[in-house]
Amino acid sequence: MKKFLALLLALAMTLSLVACGGNTNTDANQGGDDANTDGEKTYKVAMICDSSINDGGWGAACYNAMVKAAEAKNWTYEVTDSISQDAYYDSIVAYCALGYDMIYAPGNQYTDAVLQAAEEYPDIAFALLNGAEDTPAKAVNGNVSSLLPNAQQIGWIAGALAGLMTESGKLGFIGGMELDTTKGKIAGFEEAAKYVGEQEGKTVELLPVVYANSFSDAPKGKEFATTLISQGADVFFGDASAVDSGAREAIDAANTAAGSIKIYDIGQPADILGQNPCIICSQVTDNAAMIEVCMDAVVAGNFGGTTVFGTLENGGLSAGAINTELVPAEKVEKYNAYLQQMMDGTFMK
């Protein structure tokens, strides 16, 4: 019954694209200048997302990564965003029914829906960002790959800077959902911040982590950040998409009220320096490179059953530009040294 409803959704999407050029609930685009001019097969990728692609955070970064990869490989691309959890499967299957070659699901929360659809559509590739390392083995048709940035290193990148910059010794972390990948980021953030703080003669603590149980509830992020600020948090990191945007609103408001910027935020997973006055740096994940690996495998006919890793060592992870107006030069130098230690495998050793 659910598959039948998804097929009806696919028909509705097709009619929408014909009538409105793909600009209603979806965003259909040509992937490159030569995508339909060489007489060869045009490959198609579709992304589904429970947050908005205009959220200035996770949703936007993941969408932009797909666009970058599609344009590099001359694929066409489409997205359906801001969907509810009960629409994950139907949205995926709708694209399967329309003949898309690859489904890109940017989050561990889509795992069950991806595995169900992958079983029903053995000829379609499913790329699951932040999918568990053992998820591909659970796909009975071998048509699922996990794209897995190193969660501990993501936390390290943010945590080292937080440890350098905190004055209160108290840090805030806001999560979207209590996912294993989020827990890994929290652990890395906390251990790096405490280690760097200790090197600087400071005692650093992570205040109790709060979860919004959503990636789109910006007001909840604002509420959480306001509470954490009242508890003394002066450096924030998060893993909650639009919820993070709400948190930054609260941080900016607190800084404005104080008359100076003394509470900071570290963005992710794209370089968003300048988006808010409070942002001092960003943890950057090159999701596009991992998506391109998957696209190449689809074209070569050997997609699936693997995990594509993103690390500091292979360039999949990095730190973005630093706000040198807020981060003193000596701390920039120390931060870069810590990043080099992470790449050398000597950090915290």
Placement of each model-derived feature along the sequence:
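Sec-dependent N-terminal signal peptides of Gram-positive bacterial secreted proteins and lipoproteins
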Residues: 3-23
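A residue-level marker of the well-folded mature domains of exported/periplasmic proteins
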Residues: 20, 28-349
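Residue-level detector of alpha-helical hydrophobic segments embedded in or interacting with membranes
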Residues: 2-3, 117
